[in-house]
């Protein structure tokens, strides 16, 4: 019973969530295992699997609690490695501001780089800005431009929340994680798991070979040619915003609502 209570305590408290491997005869301690690493390491006891199930549930509950009232979002994906002054950082900042001015809440992964830039752009125009941060081995701290942020243990929970509240997705320059998020969004739309939301890819020179790959997929019959219409590629903030307005506001009956407490961040779009 004592062991059960200790495990449940670790499950509920993020500060105690990491489990350490047993120490050897030396004074060296094995590095801590993260929750997702433990989850994916293979079969464990049924009790341990149940503990993981509850931890996943708690991740979702934290996300639902923090994000429930953020309003319709546009999620911006991109690299955590780019710094202020990089052209893609500045483009993401402008895009974040334009998305916020359109009435959407800007949602990102909550970290540095492109994520920070988009959140920062939203705050530049007093828009709403939220993040879904992830626990990493080398801690990724939330950026300083967030109205609300939830830090999660599991990547798949994070990706679900980044999709759940959004009516469009903007993909900026990034690496493997950004590609993962791009293909996840496209697959969910393609298979009808989410509505026909739009995916805007910005940085056409950077993504040129990938866009050609999509054309090759269609030519080889790996995807339907109509699937190419899911992606809108541009380097223009104005074109991107016009496309989002056309594809993400009118079709879903979103309306811009200005409330008396807009200075508290309560203004924005709502679904009719």
Segment roles from a protein language model:
Residues 66-69, 98-100, 123, 140-144, ...:
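Solvent-exposed alpha-helices and their adjacent loops that cap or buttress functional pockets
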Residues 153-205, 251-253:
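Active-site/ligand-binding-proximal alpha/beta "capping" segment
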Residues 72-75, 104-105, 127-131, 147-150, ...:
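Structural motif
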Residues 2-33, 37-134, 141:
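Glycine-rich beta-alpha loop segments
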Residues 113-172:
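Acidic/glycine-enriched connector segments
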Residues 201-272:
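C-terminal functional extensions of proteins
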Residues 135-141, 178, 206-209:
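Short gly/pro/ser/thr-enriched loop/turn and capping motifs at secondary-structure boundaries
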């Amino acid at each position: 019973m004592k062991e059960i209570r200790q495990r449940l305590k670790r499950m509920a408290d993020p500060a105690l969530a990491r489990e350490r491997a047993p120490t050897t005869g030396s004074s060296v301690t094995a590095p801590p295992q993260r929750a997702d690493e433990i989850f994916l390491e293979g079969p464990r006891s049924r009790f341990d699997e149940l503990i993981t199930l509850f931890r996943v549930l708690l991740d979702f509950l934290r996300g639902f609690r923090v994000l429930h009232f953020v309003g319709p979002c546009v999620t911006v994906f991109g690299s955590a490695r780019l710094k202020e002054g990089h052209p893609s950082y500045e483009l993401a900042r402008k895009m974040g501001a334009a998305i916020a001015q359109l009435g959407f809440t800007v949602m990102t992964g909550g970290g540095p780089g492109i994520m920070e830039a988009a959140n920062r752009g939203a705050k530049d125009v007093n828009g709403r800005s939220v993040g879904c941060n992830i626990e990493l081995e080398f801690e990724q701290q939330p950026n300083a431009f967030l109205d609300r942020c939830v830090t999660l243990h599991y990547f798949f929970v994070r990706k679900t929340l980044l999709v759940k509240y959004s009516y469009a997705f903007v993909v900026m320059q990034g690496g493997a994680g950004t590609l993962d998020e791009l293909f996840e969004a496209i697959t969910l739309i393609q298979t009808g798991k989410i509505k026909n939301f739009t995916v805007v890819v910005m940085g056409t020179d950077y993504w040129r070979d990938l866009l050609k790959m999509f054309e090759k997929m269609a030519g080889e019959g790996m995807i339907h040619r109509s699937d190419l219409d899911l992606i809108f590629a541009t380097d223009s903030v104005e074109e991107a915003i016009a496309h989002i307005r056309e594809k993400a506001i009118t079709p879903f009956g979103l309306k811009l609502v200005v409330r008396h407490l807009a200075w508290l961040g309560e203004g924005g779009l709502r679904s009719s």
